[in-house]
């Protein structure tokens, strides 16, 4: 009985100290919070205790105290009016025996404004209370700072987009940030990440990109939030071209920083492939095709004959351009050059033709890639191809244009692919229509004349547009639909004084000469095939006759079998023993 009274006395003493410690100290603080209509607000109160937590609650103070939510370490959460507590309040334990009690208010309206009280019951500190005056701003104009940027990057690389864009001096130690991406199909924005930067340096991510764009196949598993609130996109794809990412920073109730970044994607194309199409009569018409694959954005294909850029509209040469867009976003360009034979005398017996692709790359430059060269003789079927040109990257220096009385001669056989700075070049051709896209280029054309041995180096800066033209038919393909544009060009240009040009390109390959009797190669091939068929038929007939002779021959002679030898069995005599007696022996 005495032990029971001792335990009761100790229990009551502890309860008295507990109640005394709880009501010993009360801390009250008050803070004003400003919010705009339709925004989300998070009210947070945090503290650290020496002992343990007893209870935490949120209430709205009007004429009376309306309970919103209660948290007890043993019994858990309770929210009034049957509202779900998962989206309304959160309790987070912080290091060093601390805690954070947050109330989430979504889609702010005038009815939500008022006084909100956060009460923390601690032992042995006592009761701590913090009151928020939530005010709704309806006609307050925020001080916005907007900045727009463009980042150029090649495909399959990692894109890093800073949020502040050199404006860190305008940002305080505590702010709210959010990353979003523009949805071009619906003309809306999709939230990627949202968080809060506290005064003590901690960062809290409220919404991560995994929860909002998990169903998006274009940005899934490619967006991450790095240090200094930078957004990382890896790897970059063709479909990211033109995509706009925006970072919103709210420093205070009246100050918003907004930075938008537009992505521009580039892809280096493959080396263009030039082939000569089969024609029924090469003496009347010759056709060449230049194919460029895996290019983005759109590139330009230009043609050269004996080093002369085809830009003058004359009779004899026609060019048709086609564009195709694949499912992967890459473009495939095709240019067909048709040369019609002219009765005018030519300055040279052979011509060398090739194509060049001019594709834009980051840094306001152009990537020039030349195909192999095809050389053919005029008035015959002889044609050959040179090996592909070497590929180099360099800066192109421009020189004054030559006089109008001198036209450029053949391109050297050891030309190179050059990276041209578009910003340093100026076109010297006629202006293009307003709806055409212009690409300027610079080339060096060495030429020689029969009257002098001096070699001059001249720079031409031709400019060509393939998007639209008053004299040609436009061509664009989307979703595997082909359209084309056609342009007419001239024969090979010559010098004004009629000087003879020398071609230093060596002809290699297989040469097929035309027979003297005028018989074309299809007739020869048909005759050879006919002879082969006759020989094959004769062979089959001979084999059938041989098989028939074998079947009609008489069977071979077989000798008769040898005679059968018969033996005589003698009957037993009376003197012989019977069988059963012989058996007993």
UniProtKB/Swiss-Prot annotation:
Subunit-level organization: Homodimer; disulfide-linked. Interacts with PVR.
Cited Gene3D superfamilies: Immunoglobulins
Tissues showing expression: Expressed on normal T-cell lines and clones, and some transformed T-cells, but no other cultured cell lines tested. It is expressed at very low levels on activated B-cells.
UniProt GO cellular component terms: cytoplasm; plasma membrane
Keywords: Cell adhesion, Chromosomal rearrangement, Craniosynostosis, Disease variant, Disulfide bond, Glycoprotein, Immunoglobulin domain, Membrane, Repeat, Signal, Transmembrane, Transmembrane helix
Disease / disorder: C syndrome: A syndrome characterized by trigonocephaly, severe intellectual disability, hypotonia, variable cardiac defects, redundant skin, and dysmorphic facial features, including upslanted palpebral fissures, epicanthal folds, depressed nasal bridge, and low-set, posteriorly rotated ears.
InterPro entries noted in UniProt: CD96 (IPR042381), Ig-like_dom (IPR007110), Ig-like_dom_sf (IPR036179), Ig-like_fold (IPR013783), Ig_sub (IPR003599)
Classification via PROSITE patterns: IG_LIKE
Gene Ontology biological process terms in this record: cell adhesion; cell-matrix adhesion; immune response; inflammatory response; negative regulation of natural killer cell cytokine production; negative regulation of type II interferon production; response to lipopolysaccharide
Residues covered by region (Disordered): 385-475
Lineage: Eukaryota, Metazoa, Chordata, Craniata, Vertebrata
Annotated S-S bridges: 45-118, 163-247, 290-355
N-terminal signal peptide: 1-21
Composition-biased stretches (Polar residues): 385-418, 426-452, 460-475
Protein name: T-cell surface protein tactile
Function in brief: May be involved in adhesive interactions of activated T and NK cells during the late phase of the immune response. Promotes NK cell-target adhesion by interacting with PVR present on target cells. May function at a time after T and NK cells have penetrated the endothelium using integrins and selectins, when they are actively engaging diseased cells and moving within areas of inflammation.
Transmembrane segments: 520-540
Native species: Homo sapiens
Positions on the Cytoplasmic side per record topology: 541-585
Spans within the Extracellular topological domain: 22-519
Annotated localization: Membrane
Positions of glycan attachment: 42, 97, 107, 148, 156, 166, 200, 215, 277-278, 300, 350, 368, 435, 497
Gene name of this polypeptide: CD96
Protein's membrane topology: Single-pass type I membrane protein
């Amino acid at each position: 009985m005495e032990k029971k009274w001792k335990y009761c006395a100790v229990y009551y003493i502890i309860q008295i100290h507990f109640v005394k410690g709880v009501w010993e100290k009360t801390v009250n603080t008050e803070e004003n919070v400003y919010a705009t209509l339709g925004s989300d607000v998070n009210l947070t109160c945090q503290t650290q205790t020496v002992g343990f937590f007893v209870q935490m609650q949120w209430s709205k103070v009007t004429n009376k105290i309306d309970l919103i939510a209660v948290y007890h370490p043993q019994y858990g959460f309770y929210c009034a009016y049957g509202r779900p507590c998962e989206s309304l309040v959160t309790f987070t334990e912080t290091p060093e025996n601390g805690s954070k009690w947050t109330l989430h208010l979504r889609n702010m309206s005038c009815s939500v404004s008022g006084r909100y009280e956060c009460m923390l019951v601690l032992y042995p500190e006592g009761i701590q209370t913090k009151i928020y005056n939530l005010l709704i701003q309806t006609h307050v104009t925020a001080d916005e700072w907007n900045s727009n940027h463009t980042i150029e990057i090649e495909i399959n690389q990692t894109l890093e987009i800073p949020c502040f864009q050199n404006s860190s001096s305008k940002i305080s130690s505590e702010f709210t940030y959010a990353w979003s991406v523009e949805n071009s199909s619906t003309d809306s924005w999709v939230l990627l990440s949202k968080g809060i930067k506290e005064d003590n340096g901690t960062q809290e991510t409220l919404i991560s990109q995994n929860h909002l764009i998990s169903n998006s196949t274009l940005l899934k598993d490619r967006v991450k939030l790095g240090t200094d609130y930078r957004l990382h996109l890896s790897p970059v794809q063709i479909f990211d071209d033109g995509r706009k990412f925006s970072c919103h920073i709210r420093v205070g109730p009246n100050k918003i920083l907004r930075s938008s970044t537009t992505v521009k994607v580039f892809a280096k194309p493959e080396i263009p492939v030039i082939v000569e199409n089969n024609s029924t009569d090469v003496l009347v018409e010759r056709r060449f095709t230049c194919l460029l694959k895996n290019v983005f954005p759109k590139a330009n294909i230009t043609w050269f004959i004996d080093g002369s850029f085809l830009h003058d509209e004359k009779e004899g040469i026609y060019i048709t351009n086609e564009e195709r867009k694949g499912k992967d976003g890459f473009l495939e360009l095709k240019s067909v050059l048709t040369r019609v034979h002219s009765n005018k005398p030519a300055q040279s017996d052979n011509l060398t033709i090739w194509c060049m692709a001019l594709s834009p790359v980051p840094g306001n430059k152009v990537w020039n890639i030349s195909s192999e060269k095809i050389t053919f003789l005029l008035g015959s079927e002889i044609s050959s191809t040179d090996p592909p040109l070497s590929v180099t990257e360099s800066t192109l220096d421009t020189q004054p244009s030559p006089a109008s009385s001198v036209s450029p001669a053949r391109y050297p056989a050891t030309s190179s692919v050059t990276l041209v700075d578009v910003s340093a070049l100026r076109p010297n051709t006629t202006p293009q229509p307003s709806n055409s896209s212009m690409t300027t280029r610079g080339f060096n054309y060495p030429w020689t004349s029969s009257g002098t041995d001096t070699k001059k180096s001249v720079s031409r800066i031709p400019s060509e547009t393939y998007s639209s033209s008053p004299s040609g038919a436009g061509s664009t393909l989307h979703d595997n639909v082909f359209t084309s544009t056609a342009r007419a060009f001239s024969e090979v240009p010559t010098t004004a004084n009629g000087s003879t040009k020398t071609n230093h390109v060596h002809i290699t390959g297989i040469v097929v000469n035309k027979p003297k009797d005028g018989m074309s190669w299809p007739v020869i091939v048909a005759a050879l095939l006919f002879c082969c068929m006759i020989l094959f038929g004769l062979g089959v007939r001979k084999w059938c006759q041989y098989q028939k002779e074998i079947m009609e021959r008489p069977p071979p002679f077989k000798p008769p079998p040898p005679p059968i030898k018969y033996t005589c069995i003698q009957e037993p005599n009376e003197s012989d023993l019977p069988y059963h007696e012989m058996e007993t022996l």
